[in-house]
């Protein structure tokens, strides 16, 4: 799945993946990470997610990365911010009220970009990626994160043959395969959510689950 695919989705406003409300699992399970106020949270492939507003309201600094400048601009405009905009070589940076968004390719991130990060929130990143890209994504993420980081990960799982993603199906077994060698994985909850998602029913899905994981990167 090429970068142009996502840029075109934003240009055409084909953003059914965007949630207008705060994700309920975020407020319910974020305390499990035990992140102190004032710490910094990284939100990969952040889009214009309002979850970043909730994180900021918890007195956390937010660092997001997003490919589409339209998404970044929309986030600040729709939430009433007047950001400072700094043009860079690999990333343009937008800053306002403790929220810092880097506009560019996730795979161009370096350790220096995430040096001050204390936790990660991934609701829509891993499930946005096709199977052939997920290993590269998780390898790069774990490579550039500081040690001893906690990650709140939310995934979808459904019979992949019944629908072409995104969002793609990511099973518990795949989470363990992607992250198990370098993190400790704890399944916090799993819910059957098909009846709450008619758009998936309309596409012929017979089963839909959401899982919430707490991942803890190992120090060695």
Curated annotation (Swiss-Prot):
Disulfide bridge positions per record: none
InterPro entries: SAM-dependent_MTases_sf, Thiopur_S-MeTfrase_Se/Te_detox, Thiopurine_S-MeTrfase, TPMT
Gene3D superfamilies: Vaccinia Virus protein VP39
Cellular component aspect of the GO annotation: cytoplasm
Pfam families per UniProt: TPMT (PF05724)
Protein family: Belongs to the class I-like SAM-binding methyltransferase superfamily. TPMT family.
Protein name as annotated: Thiopurine S-methyltransferase
């Amino acid at each position: 799945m090429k970068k142009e695919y996502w840029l075109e989705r934003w240009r055409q406003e084909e953003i059914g993946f965007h949630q207008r409300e705060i994700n309920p699992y975020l407020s319910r399970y974020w305390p499990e990470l035990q992140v102190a106020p004032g710490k910094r949270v990284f939100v990969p492939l952040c889009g214009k997610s309002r979850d970043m507003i909730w994180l900021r309201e918890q007195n956390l600094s937010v660092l997001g990365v997003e490919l589409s400048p339209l998404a970044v601009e929309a986030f600040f405009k729709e939430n009433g911010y007047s950001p400072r905009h700094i043009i860079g070589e690999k990333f343009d940076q937008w800053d306002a009220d403790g929220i810092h968004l880097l506009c560019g390719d996730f795979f161009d991130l370096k350790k220096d970009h995430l040096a001050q990060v204390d936790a990660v929130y991934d609701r829509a990143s891993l499930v946005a990626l096709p199977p052939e890209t997920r290993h590269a994504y998780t390898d790069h993420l774990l490579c550039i994160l500081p040690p001893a980081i906690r990650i709140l990960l939310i995934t979808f799982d459904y019979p992949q043959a019944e629908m072409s993603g995104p969002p793609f199906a990511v099973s518990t077994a795949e989470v363990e395969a992607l992250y198990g060698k370098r993190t400790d994985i704890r399944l916090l909850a799993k819910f059957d959510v098909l009846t709450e998602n008619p758009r998936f029913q309309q596409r012929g899905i017979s089963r839909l689950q959401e899982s919430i994981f707490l991942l803890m990167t190992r120090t060695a």
